[in-house]
């Protein structure tokens, strides 16, 4: 078996625990978790990832991690063997989204990062997958990232480029994954991406919210396994 390296990119306020189950399921593959806490732009995050990654690798990113993955595909498409874009969007922030991010930053500074995480928890997971244990994992990740990391990430998200015009130029095997009950990023974005990226495969997960790697660990691991098989074949 060709054990392709995979770089996993966490989302906003997420640590490697976002991919805990996938890391276990893909044992044997060299796995790296991208640093998404040190930089205040998506481009800088992508450049840091590329400096640290092997020559050729597969990529998966959830939410903000997907923004970084798309930027990696823009900067160094020749190094990416396959990509899984999960619970993410190719579009730039709307003014309303940006205003909400500034409000969350203010809440984090006033009430602490845990308060923000508990606020977000209500919208991050589907009712069918919500549990106290899952909520606590989400809060623990946020606490580990901390306020300054959160502010840098939000700045990166606010300033991210719109990648809509680039989707049709992507030449690597791409799997687009979304939860049908995602209340953060409309599943419609996944359909748009899959329809525009040549040869992209679309995986829609029923009764699943934004944190799909944690909500549907087995299904997501299977999707990543298939993506890695495409990378090895490519």
Predicted features and spans:
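Flexible "cap/lid" loop of the alpha/beta hydrolase fold
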Residues: 74-75, 79-118
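Conserved alpha/beta-hydrolase catalytic His-Asp/Glu region
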Residues: 93-96, 111-168
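Conserved alpha/beta-hydrolase "acid-adjacent" motif
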Residues: 183-189
């Amino acid at each position: 078996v060709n054990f392709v390296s995979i770089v996993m990119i966490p989302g906003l306020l997420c640590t490697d625990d976002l991919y805990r189950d996938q890391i276990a399921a893909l044992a044997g593959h060299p796995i790296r978790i991208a640093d998404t806490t040190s930089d205040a732009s998506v481009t800088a995050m992508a450049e840091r990832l590329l400096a640290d990654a092997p020559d050729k690798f597969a990529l998966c990113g959830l939410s903000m991690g997907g923004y970084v993955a798309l930027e990696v595909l823009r900067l160094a498409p020749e190094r990416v063997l396959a990509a899984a874009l999960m619970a993410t969007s190719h579009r730039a922030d709307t003014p309303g989204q940006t205003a909400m991010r500034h409000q969350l930053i203010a809440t984090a500074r006033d009430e602490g990062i845990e308060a923000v995480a508990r606020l977000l928890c209500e919208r991050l997971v589907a009712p069918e997958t919500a549990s106290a244990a899952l909520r606590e994992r989400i809060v623990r990740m946020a606490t580990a990232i901390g306020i300054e990391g959160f502010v840098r990430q939000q700045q990166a998200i606010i300033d991210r480029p719109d990648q809509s015009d680039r989707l049709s130029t992507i030449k690597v095997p791409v799997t687009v994954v979304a939860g049908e009950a995602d209340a953060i990023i409309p599943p419609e974005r996944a359909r748009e991406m899959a329809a525009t990226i040549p040869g992209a495969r679309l995986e829609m997960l029923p009764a699943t919210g934004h944190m799909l790697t944690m909500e549907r660990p087995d299904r997501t691991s299977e999707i990543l396994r298939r993506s890695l098989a495409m990378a090895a074949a490519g």
